[in-house]
Amino acid sequence: MATASEVQSLNDINYKSKIKIALLVILVFFLFVFSFLSFYPIGDKLKSVIKSALSAQGCNPDFDEVHMEWLLPKIVVSNLVIPAPCLQRTGPALNFSHLTINYHIINFAPFGLPFRIDTSFGGQPLEVYLVQGFSGQMIRLKDQALDLAKLQPLFGENVKISGKVTVDLNMGINDNVISNLTLKAQSKNLVIPPQNIQGFTTPPLKLNELYLEAISESSPRIQIEKLVVGDTDAPVRANFKGKIDLQNGNAAMSPLDLKGEIAFSEAFRQALPIIDMMFQAFNQKDGFYQVRLGGTLGSPKPIAQ
């Protein structure tokens, strides 16, 4: 228990004065940081740092300018250009007319600095949440509605697909490798343009329905919990689950091991006679071929079960 003299000494402390001094120190520090960032050529310095850090990897992104905005604090980047080598691919660079990085309150699960990145590509608005931790990053898309046709350049020349899909993604990355993943994607108007299969050109596939659930708890394996393609009127209907061992830097070469079933409409089989030849050795159940998908993500191979 405190003595009378100790209580008296506590009462003598001028707490209001100490609070005022602390607030004054914080205010002076804030004004110093504000003045420094307002007049310091942060854009040129940041561009130099980025180029130096990434040039050894064959990646040289560029932008016109970067500046700070203090109303709802954020960094604004204009005319961002990301060359294809930065994404470990070939082809033209990706251009973003603007990109804003908005700072949020410190995140504790996982611990790190959280940001919201707002931009657009091909007329498609994009909103990505990013947490930068000590040893990795966490990327989050919250029920993002995406127009696949507008994002075609992001997929590369070998992926042709259109329609609108809603994506909910939570992905952790450590040392440029996916450490954990939770993904849900859904579409009601998915269309695959004409494709060439062994010399035969397929008609446009109006699949309409797409539903995907995938998780990953240990790299590089991604577990496909559910993959449903095509509604009752679609020329192709399929239902699969299984696993993909994702190859870092070359996703197309990722080995597949999916099991499920697939069915084709009569009109589609007549338009593409090779279908009957390809699946003549497969068992059928209720009009669906029982299939195991092997091969790779870029070149899947149907195998009879």
Predicted regions located by residue number:
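Generic short beta-strand segments
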Residues: 78-83, 142-150, 186-193
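Beta-propeller and related beta-repeat scaffolds in trafficking/envelope systems
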Residues: 85, 89-106, 182-221, 265-301
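Short, hydrophobic/aromatic-rich segments at coil-to-beta transitions
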Residues: 110-117, 137-138, 219-226
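Flexible, solvent-exposed coil segments and beta strand-coil junctions
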Residues: 144-152, 217-223
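Intrinsically disordered, low-complexity segments enriched in Gly and acidic/Ser/Thr residues
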Residues: 204-274
